[in-house]
Amino acid sequence: MASAGLYRRVLPSPPAIDFASPEGKKIFVEALGQGTMEGFFKLVSYYQTQSEPAYCGLATLTVVLNALSIDPGRKWKGPWRWFDDSMLDCCEPLEKIKVQGITFGKVACLARCNGAHVEAFRSNESTVSDFRDRVISCCSSEDRHLIVSYHRSGLKQTGEGHFSPIGGYHAERDMVLILDVTRYKYPPHWVPLTLLWDAMNTIDRATGLQRGYMIISKLKRAPSILYTVSCRHEGWSSVAKFLTENVPLLLKSEDLKDIQEVLSVVFKSPPSELREFITWIAEVRRQEDGNLTLSEEEKGRLAIKADILEQIRTTTLFKHVTSWLDSQRSRCRTIAKLQDRDMLPELAAGVCCQGACLLTGCCLPGGKCCSQIDVKHLNVDHKNIVTLVSGTVASGSSSEQGVDVLVPLCQMGPEGHCIGMHPSTADVLTVLLLALPLHTWSGIKEEKLCAEVTSLLTTENLPPLLQEEVRFSLETVLF
């Protein structure tokens, strides 16, 4: 016997005003004249209904990412790269979200993981006046959009926690337009800003933290040039917990005497996924008729990567990390989790396979879709040498596609061999340490050692490019 089901809900009005009602249209026209509906048209062009009852956070973010014209870097269907809520899986398993929904922090994490700039404010970190100012700023722009996390009961609606984008603002009435992504339940509607603030100023029982709002915009450059936190890796959350929660406790419990002992606490018994947590970004391109030349844009990007890598290697922290790794070489088991994929051919095979997935749709695990891995060294400008790793991808039953992986740096050794061809374990661990909050080290008992560690890990004196790399990694870890 079929169940009756539900067909929509009556929008509680007041306090809400249906966007399509005569009064809702009047408010829209007035707000349009005030210049606070500028973001509406981009948002409504990509406005969609969430595909699952608990996907409000994913659908909201999908609307905003598409409105900002952010390239997801992977295919949706056919040849098309496009954000769909089923693709936002890098911070929380979709099966878990489908049952439990998603929290404020994880939505912010998803936005960052997918290439957006995020400014997140929980209600206890802001005021209603701050919120109003930011609503006006975002609604007066096409380039910044505001997402709200609120409890529906505050608007006399059925349901609990919910996410939606804000589509506009009316100054005289002090009302905001909520583009509700549960369009099967409620239509877009205007609500008083202060009432929405009260609905945001509530506790999410899943985390014990306040709800809030976040501003999403497009990054002016790639989120990271050389390194990225691998939040798509299934073990990333356990690694983040180890680094931000366990490490501070371990440091407090040990009587440490020098930097080497501090590094041992952090790296001797890490989670098995640590080696995958921060990875270097390689550039992948299709092979074009055996063309081995680089475009000016490719040369520029590789030069920046080489600069950042050089900046890492000139830090005192890098020297300490290198010394610690050298001291552990004879204990292979100790550092196996950190170095099991440090050889360029193995790394390149994995990157080649990821590139193949992006460029051809061939997505096989473990680098199995790439064959005939070949390493070449190209003179870029008679001074700098770039490493080019080529592979062949079987993209169909009989067709093949050549794929090139551009490696950031190649230095020639005394015998003419290429050395230091890619970011090493020492480079990655250095960036990882720099990305941790300074309060991580505050529990070190020996005051002089604590001061020395803090000095080593302070980022304010780093070169700007390296600061930006570290800042992005830090923000991702904290979310």
Swiss-Prot record:
Please give the InterPro entries that the UniProt record associates with this protein.
Answer: Papain-like_cys_pep_sf, PCS-like, PCS_N, PCS_N_sf, Phytochelatin_synthase_C
Q: Which residues form the Peptidase C83 domain?
A: 1-221
Q: GO annotations under biological process?
A: cellular detoxification of cadmium ion; detoxification of copper ion; phytochelatin biosynthetic process
- Activity regulation description: Requires cadmium for activity.
**Which molecular function GO terms apply here?**
glutathione gamma-glutamylcysteinyltransferase activity; metal ion binding
Q: Of which family is this protein a member?
A: Belongs to the phytochelatin synthase family.
Tell me what this protein is called: Glutathione gamma-glutamylcysteinyltransferase 3
Source organism per entry reads Lotus japonicus
Gene for this chain: PCS3
